[in-house]
């Protein structure tokens, strides 16, 4: 079979092209937008399917150098660390802290359930992490970023499993959030249905006012944390006796730098600029990672994956109904938060916002939910998820 090898520059061009293709397809196919499927996922999977067809027919297989993919992944997770502002968390109120605690509990449960199912079916429990919080609460970005660590730990095809599971989560997170919230609202008589559609929040695009100088400051902070973080990752690995993901040190250094800047008021932190850079790095590295998926590796894991993902769906439904809704107050805001929790707990914050938008159009807005969900799902959640996943990989590898 002919092997077509792309160097890192070709791979970068491929990632950009697949991202552009994904943007076109998500605009042309409304069903993709409806389920909040990100453009890098769409474009990358298109190439992965094309490559799988070439492989299955014995025509050729396309491989590429993933050096820049790793660099962009580290940059992205470093920007995640910059979002963790402890003063902001303390000021955000009881609801945010309570939901963050519930989210951490869900991260642990998702990994226990996923690993348990895989172990019962005679597969490596590491594949259970791929079907657990890596894919569910983590979403496609975390799946593509952490998947290679599963491969390195011995779970061959871990990236492919994680991304496939994340795609499943995106769809079911969108399908379940609204109906479950409606069930809670109707059953508990929380609010009457609106006579007509009166709410028109736009949840698809986030707009920032950014400045060139702040971009420079933000990029310098990013480079510094990525460099120092590499040393921290090596030190942590040597001290703890098991391998940490390459990005974990950079993320921890970013947390420290962010909170030192906030505490001593050294400068106005360039949050908008760093968030924009994070979105850019995520889009390119995700497109590259998904383009490199070897979908033929899913064949032997199809049945265990189906069982594990079904268990994750059941876990989310039960936890949302019996824990999230009661703990958050059993009122309309709690029902709306439950819809959002299902969205980011099985996919991404964009799913959460889309779920809440659908509910609010029918029953009216919930300002509390629109504040709490982005704070937890968009700011703090990724950090705790990455830290717990790193521990679990070290434990199971």
Spell out what each predicted region is.
Residues 21-33, 79-91, 180, 257-271, ...:
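C-terminal ends of transmembrane helices
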Residues 25-41, 53, 58, 62, ...:
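Flexible hinge motifs at transmembrane-helix junctions and intramembrane kinks/re-entrant loops
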Residues 71, 85-115, 167, 276, ...:
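Entry/N-cap segments of selected transmembrane alpha helices
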Residues 117-157, 161, 168, 180, ...:
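Alpha-helical membrane segments and immediately flanking helix-loop junctions
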Residues 18, 45-52, 65-93, 251-261, ...:
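Hydrophobic transmembrane alpha-helices of secondary-active transporters
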């Amino acid at each position: 079979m002919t092997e077509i090898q792309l160097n890192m520059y070709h791979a970068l061009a491929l990632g950009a092209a697949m991202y552009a293709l994904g943007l076109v397809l998500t605009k042309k196919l409304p069903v993709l937008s409806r389920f909040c499927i990100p453009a890098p996922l769409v474009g990358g999977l298109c190439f992965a399917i094309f490559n799988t067809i070439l492989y299955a027919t014995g025509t050729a297989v396309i491989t590429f150098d993933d050096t820049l993919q790793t660099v962009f992944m580290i940059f992205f997770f470093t920007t995640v660390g910059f979002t963790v502002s402890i003063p902001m968390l303390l000021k955000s109120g009881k609801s945010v802290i309570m939901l963050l605690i519930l989210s951490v509990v869900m991260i642990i449960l998702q990994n226990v359930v996923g690993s348990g199912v895989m172990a019962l079916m005679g597969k490596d429990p590491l594949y259970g992490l791929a079907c657990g919080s890596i894919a569910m609460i983590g979403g496609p970005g975390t799946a593509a970023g952490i998947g290679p660590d599963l491969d390195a730990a011995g779970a061959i095809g871990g990236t492919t499993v994680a991304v496939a599971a994340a795609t499943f989560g995106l769809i079911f997170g969108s399908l379940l959030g609204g109906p479950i919230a409606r069930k809670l609202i109707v059953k508990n008589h929380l609010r009457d249905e609106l006579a007509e559609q009166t709410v028109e929040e736009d949840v698809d695009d986030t707009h920032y006012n950014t400045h060139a100088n702040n971009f420079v400051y933000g990029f310098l902070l990013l480079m510094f944390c990525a460099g120092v973080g590499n040393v921290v990752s090596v030190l942590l690995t040597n001290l703890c006796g098991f391998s940490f993901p390459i990005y974990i040190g950079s993320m921890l250094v970013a947390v420290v730098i962010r909170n030192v800047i906030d505490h001593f008021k050294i400068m106005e932190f360039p949050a908008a600029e760093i968030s924009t850079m994070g979105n850019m790095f995520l889009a390119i590295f995700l497109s590259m990672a998904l383009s490199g998926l070897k979908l033929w590796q899913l064949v032997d894991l199809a049945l265990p994956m189906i069982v594990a993902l079904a268990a994750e769906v059941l876990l989310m439904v039960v936890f949302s109904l019996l824990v999230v809704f009661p703990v958050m107050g059993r009122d309309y805001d709690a029902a709306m938060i439950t819809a959002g929790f299902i969205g980011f707990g099985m996919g991404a914050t964009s799913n959460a916002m889309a779920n809440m938008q659908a509910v609010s159009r029918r029953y009216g807005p919930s300002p509390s939910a629109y504040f709490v969900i982005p704070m937890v799902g968009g700011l703090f959640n990724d950090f705790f998820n990455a830290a717990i996943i790193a521990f679990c990989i070290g434990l199971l590898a």
